[in-house]
Amino acid sequence: YPADHYDGVFIPNWAMWFVLELGEYAERTSDRELVARARERVYALLSYFRRFENEFGLLEKLESWVFLEWSKSNDLVQDVSFPSNMLYAKMKLVMSELYGDAALAEEAQRMQAVIRDLSYTADGFFCDNAYRRDGRLVLSGEYTESCQYYAFHTGTATPALYPELWQRLVHDFGRDRRETKKWENVHYANAFIGNYLRM
């Protein structure tokens, strides 16, 4: 999604954007017919992802090309990608609204709570990923600007929940951070898709 692939490589987490876009389309147009026609396909997508859910309800070891954005983020996608899981939780929330599925809303809220608990660190940022080590998830200790944007864009984080991080992103991050050299422990975002999420 959205294009044909001839070598069998695909981007599993990118299909989640289709569900978010369907939700935005329904909100703008009130086209319930299209939403109803998409139901089978949307739930098939959810069924595909179910097999990757771990004991925390988070996606782990997604197959093929896990794409987040053209930056360091793409090196930090295994074993548990927190931005992908933020997007997955948002996908479930949108599905719950589109199809009146209260169970999915509860799942999404649990996922967001788990992500906040596991990924947000004492450094004041969301860590991008965790590796499975001896049966436990261990944070990589890597932070990217785009991961922070995914957190707020998907509602996993809000300005009310993380006011310091929000202020930091608003005032210290953005186009001139390479010049100001603020927060050099956080890898820079790129135009696609991190800077779009910032907007």
Locations of regions flagged by a protein language model:
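Active-site core of glycosidic bond-cleaving carbohydrate-active enzymes
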Residues: 1-199
